[in-house]
Amino acid sequence: MASVCEICAKGELSGNNVSHSHLKTRRTWKPNIQRVRAVVEGEVKRVNVCTRCLRSGKVQRAL
C-alpha cells in the first residue's frame, strides 16, 4: 500500500531510535493511510487518504 496521502501529500518521515545508552538506529514514521472510496471530480474512485484528511472533512466518502 502506498504510504502517501493523495489529498495532502503527507508521507513518511525518518529519524532515529535512541536507546537508554544513547545508541541511535534509523527508523521511519509512517502516516495512517486508509484506502477509501471517495467522490473525486464527480466520480467514485478508490484513493489513499490519511486519517486526518478523513476526519477534517477534506474527503467526500462515496456511499
UniProtKB/Swiss-Prot annotation:
Annotated Pfam families: Ribosomal_L28
Keyword terms: Ribonucleoprotein, Ribosomal protein
InterPro entries: Bacterial_rp_bL28 (IPR050096), Ribosomal_bL28 (IPR026569), Ribosomal_bL28/bL31-like_sf (IPR034704), Ribosomal_bL28_bact-type (IPR001383), Ribosomal_bL28_sf (IPR037147)
SUPFAM superfamilies xrefs: L28p-like
Single GO BP term: translation
Lineage, top ranks: Bacteria, Bacillati, Bacillota, Negativicutes, Selenomonadales
Coiled coil: none
Organism: Selenomonas ruminantium
Protein name per the record: Large ribosomal subunit protein bL28
GO terms for MF: structural constituent of ribosome
Annotated Gene Ontology cellular component terms: ribonucleoprotein complex; ribosome
Family: Belongs to the bacterial ribosomal protein bL28 family.
